[in-house]
Regions:
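A short Gly-Trp-Pro
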Residues: 1-133
Length: 133
């Protein structure tokens, strides 16, 4: 599978090859703050499968082991990478040219969900991560 996407202004573009995994709608406070949204859709790919095809994004360390990236021109959130899992990187689902092809498979960090966000879509819900339950 080949996935293409990029930022709002088009300055940063990427292509990812291979099978995406861990498609989720994250409700954690960090993702909400970084995106300015009530929840944020991510999917994972193998780090080696991600290639920047235009300008590269700006990166910043958002926590002890997390590195986020965004477009330095328009501010679009693009990636999240955890040092504890160096072989995978999360991409912002809505940054895909066709985000409809990767709907969320679950909700993560619902313990941090805003009370007015409705999660009655039948998808599995995890208090924190999938592995933590």
């Amino acid at each position: 599978m080949s996935l293409q996407g990029g930022c709002f202004c088009g300055a940063v573009r990427y292509e990812a090859h291979g099978q995406p995994f861990n498609s989720t709608l994250c409700h954690c406070t960090d993702c909400r703050k970084a995106s300015g949204a009530p929840a944020f859709a991510w999917f994972s790919v193998k780090t080696v499968s991600l290639h920047w095809t235009a300008s590269a994004p700006q990166r910043f360390r958002s926590s002890e082991h997390a590195l986020r990236s965004f477009c330095p021109s328009c501010g679009t959130t693009l990636t999240w990478h955890d040092d504890r899992w160096p072989d995978e990187i999360d991409l912002a689902t809505a940054s895909l040219d066709d985000p409809e092809q990767l709907p969320p498979a679950d909700h993560t960090f619902v313990r941090s969900r805003l009370n007015w966000v409705n999660c009655d879509d039948g998808l599995p819900q995890y208090q924190t991560t999938r592995s933590s339950g």
